[in-house]
């Protein structure tokens, strides 16, 4: 008889928690809430202390401080009690200092003291301040500066470190100073870590770092800009060329890491799609550090010479919209996220958002008589919504050497499958019984059902006939749906192409065959285009999903009632039959079969250009799927991160003289890093046969390595090669 399974030690853990309390083991499963997750991290740190020969129970440690920071905004009673317990411990217990032989549970160890900066950096500064700047101490083991959970409305952490005579100059809130000049303030990490857990689960931690370059904005003003290309749509039949809209152009830039290529390299993605069956999005955190601000001046000589100087008093403005107050503007749909190459500097995209603008465009064709109805009406006063970051989101001011961390955001999303389905309606349920089986091998030897079609047993919905065939037998539901691909709907702000789930259609050049709806991506050098390509034309690819609706629209037909066998010409509507006497207009162009019986999978991850997560719509009736991203955040999503070089004015500034400020040309370089955590399920093999996996041939291998002058590209990879049954 097998010995009984050992139960995990519970310890003194209150109800509703797994790790919040002393004496429990570290294998209790997933934490129940953010406070419990902080407690688990705290327990792991304590275990590391004990292994190194230190007793954390008698001292106040950095792990205790991290727990205090992570639970400062806790809403649950256990988190509040734990928070105040360790605050009390902080007041009475001696301090325990982390050392390099004491590993953190969240990030690699680093020296706890920084070396002094080179003296020449502070020559000018020393004239104004006392000499002998002390070393700045820092807790390098704290995850993402403070590891604080970012709740709704939570405040990020800002650390301003000063190299002054006071020694340790760290503090919260905005501010400036010469701080960390010449001092390393972080790590550059682009590794993907795979931690294999129990029961076939894998924790995937994707680290990403980039050098970000930010110029000062062209203007410090918010501007309402209208795009008008009515000259294009004034020609009959050119409705799809419509670009008219209004947008608010802001002086801010958006740091957007919401694309697969920001986090995974091609080798990582190959490992994930070949070995795992589903992905769960767990948490996200990001940080800005090693801020550098410089001014640019130009000499009056010929030719002019540009001079670049560090400006220790200029500021970088940073704002985190943790409450999602501002319009949500994911940049992947415009291919404007952070770049995909870790060794290349990247830029944040200028932030702008749509403004309400009414537009009327009546459909026309080349044979239409008269001028098309082509009107833009302007903004309805009832719908005006003008957002500014300065009065909606807390803004932090960073100077050279300062840091900013968002804390940790925990996702609430449904998982994403990494397998595709092959079963369509014709492959659901029990196949018909065969009275005759083949007696020899060969493709020309078939089985035979044997029973006459009008004498078979089963269920149909035909009503007017007793014929039971593979075409007429009733299936449990409808797998996928047909949708008109080239369908444009009119809204009060103009026409738009209706999004559909990708299907398996026919040739896109045949008017009688529906296109498949697979997304087509256009992108530049930061996002996978061959870096030696010249000209302005972006590179493109069409992502042909394995997981589709299994449809074949050119084979559709509709039969008349009463149902007749065989069907005659006046009892059937074929894809090639015109509707309303219009040549080229048939029911596959306008027919939508989506309904309450429709079964459909989520959209696949598109590596590297696809969006990862999307925001849930603030509507009462919400869409079941989003076509841009496989993960849809419930209730809230990570706050957008905005940056801007603060105005660096000259003595000639006069607010009444001009709309343009008199500014010193200033730019910033800073380092950005983030951590995106997934949970994945290892794929088990349930079939005898091997399956197709993500691989490349010899010729394609050279797409992933640089040429002799550094030219390279990123080729998109499939994400759902492994098949699975759905019924």
Swiss-Prot record:
GO terms for molecular function: metal ion binding; structural molecule activity. The keyword Repeat does not apply. GO terms for cellular component: host cell; host cell nucleus; T=1 icosahedral viral capsid. Residues 166-183 have a biased composition (Gly residues). GO terms for biological process: adhesion receptor-mediated virion attachment to host cell; clathrin-dependent endocytosis of virus by host cell; entry receptor-mediated virion attachment to host cell; microtubule-dependent intracellular transport of viral material towards nucleus; symbiont entry into host cell via permeabilization of host membrane; viral penetration into host nucleus. Mg(2+) binds at residue 323. Residues 25-35 have a biased composition (Polar residues). Its main location: virion. Residues 1-10 have a biased composition (Basic residues). InterPro entries: Capsid/spike_ssDNA_virus (IPR016184), Parvovirus_coat (IPR001403), Phospholipase_A2-like (IPR013607), VP1/VP2 (IPR036952). Residues 1-39, 95-120, 141-184 are annotated as: Disordered. It is found in: Virion; Host nucleus. Residues 19-64 are annotated as: Phospholipase A2-like. Capsid protein self-assembles to form an icosahedral capsid with a T=1 symmetry, about 22 nm in diameter, and consisting of 60 copies of two size variants of the capsid proteins, VP1 and VP2, which differ by the presence of an N-terminal extension in the minor protein VP1. The capsid encapsulates the genomic ssDNA. Capsid proteins are responsible for the attachment to host cell receptor TFRC. This attachment induces virion internalization predominantly through clathrin-endocytosis. Interacts with host TFRC. This is Capsid protein VP1. The lineage of its organism: Viruses, Monodnaviria, Shotokuvirae, Cossaviricota, Quintoviricetes.
């Amino acid at each position: 008889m097998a010995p009984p399974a050992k139960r995990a030690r519970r310890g003194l853990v209150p109800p509703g928690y797994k790790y919040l309390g002393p004496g429990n083991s570290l294998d209790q499963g997933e934490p129940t809430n953010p406070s419990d997750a902080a407690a688990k991290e705290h327990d792991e740190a304590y275990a590391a202390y004990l292994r190194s020969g230190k007793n954390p129970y008698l001292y106040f440690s950095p792990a205790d401080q991290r727990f205090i920071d992570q639970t400062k905004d806790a809403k649950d009673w256990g988190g509040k009690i734990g928070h105040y317990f360790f605050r009390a411990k902080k007041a009475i217990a001696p301090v325990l200092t982390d050392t390099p032989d004491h590993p953190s549970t969240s990030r690699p160890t680093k020296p706890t003291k920084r070396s002094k900066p080179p003296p020449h950096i502070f020559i000018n500064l020393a004239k104004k301040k006392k000499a002998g700047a002390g070393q700045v101490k820092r807790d390098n083991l704290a995850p993402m500066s403070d590891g604080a959970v970012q709740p709704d409305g939570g405040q990020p952490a800002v650390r301003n470190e000063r190299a002054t005579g006071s020694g340790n100059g760290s503090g919260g809130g905005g501010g400036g100073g010469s701080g960390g000049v010449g001092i390393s303030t972080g790590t550059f990490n682009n590794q993907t870590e795979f931690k294999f857990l129990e029961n076939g689960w894998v924790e995937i931690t994707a680290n990403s770092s980039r050098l970000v370059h930010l110029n000062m904005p062209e203007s410090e003003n918010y501007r309402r800009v209208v795009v008008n290309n009515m000259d294009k749509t004034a020609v009959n039949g050119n409705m799809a060329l419509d670009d008219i809209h209004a947008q608010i152009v802001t002086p801010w830039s958006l740091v957007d890491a919401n694309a697969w290529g920001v986090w995974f390299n091609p080798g990582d993605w190959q490992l994930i799609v070949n070995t795992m069956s589903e992905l769960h999005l767990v948490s996200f955190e990001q940080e800005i550090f090693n801020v550098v601000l410089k001014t640019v001046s130009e000499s009056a000589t010929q030719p002019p010479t540009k001079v670049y100087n560090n400006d220790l008093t200029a500021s970088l403005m940073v704002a985190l919209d943790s409450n999602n107050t501002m319009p949500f503007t994911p940049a992947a749909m415009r291919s404007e996220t952070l770049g995909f190459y870790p060794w290349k500097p990247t830029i944040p995209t200028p932030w702008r958002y749509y403004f309400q603008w009414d537009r009327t465009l009546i459909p026309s064709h080349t044979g239409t008589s008269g001028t098309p109805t082509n009107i833009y009406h302007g903004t309805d006063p009832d719908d005006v919504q003008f957002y500014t970051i300065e009065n909606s989101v807390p803004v932090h001011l960073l100077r050279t050497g300062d840091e900013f961390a968002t804390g940790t955001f925990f996702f609430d999303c449904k998982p994403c499958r990494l397998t595709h389905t092959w079963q369509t309606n014709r492959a659901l349920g029990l196949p018909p019984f065969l009275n005759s089986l083949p007696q020899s091998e060969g493709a020309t030897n078939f089985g035979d059902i044997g029973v006459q079609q009008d004498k078979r047993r089963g269920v149909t919905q035909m009503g007017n006939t007793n014929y039971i065939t593979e075409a007429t037998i009733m299936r449990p539901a409808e797998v996928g749906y047909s949708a008109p691909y080239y369908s444009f709907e009119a809204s009060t702000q103009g026409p738009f192409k209706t999004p559909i789930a990708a299907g398996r259609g026919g040739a896109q050049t045949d008017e009688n065959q529906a296109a498949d709806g697979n997304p087509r991506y256009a992108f530049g050098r930061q996002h996978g285009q061959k870096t030696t390509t010249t000209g302005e034309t972006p590179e493109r690819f069409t992502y042909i999903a394995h997981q589709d609706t299994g449809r074949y629209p050119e084979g559709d037909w509709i039969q008349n009632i009463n149902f007749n066998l065989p069907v005659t010409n006046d009892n059937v509507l074929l894809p090639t039959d015109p509707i309303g006497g219009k040549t080229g207009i048939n029911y596959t162009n306008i027919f939508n079969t989506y309904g309450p019986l429709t079964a459909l999978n989520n959209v696949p991850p598109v590596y590297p250009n696809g969006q990862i997560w999307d925001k849930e719509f603030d509507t009462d009736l919400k869409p079941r799927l989003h076509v841009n991203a496989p993960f849809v955040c419930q209730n809230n999503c990570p706050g957008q991160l905005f940056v801007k070089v603060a105005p660096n004015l000259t003595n000639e500034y006069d607010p009444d003289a001009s709309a343009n400020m008199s500014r010193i040309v200033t730019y910033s370089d800073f380092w950005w890093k983030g951590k995106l955590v997934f949970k994945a399920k290892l794929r088990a093999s349930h079939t005898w046969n091997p399956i197709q996996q993500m691989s490349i041939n010899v010729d394609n291998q050279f797409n992933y390595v640089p040429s002799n002058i550094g030219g390279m590209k990123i080729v998109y990879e499939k994400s759902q090669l492994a098949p699975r049954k759905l019924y």
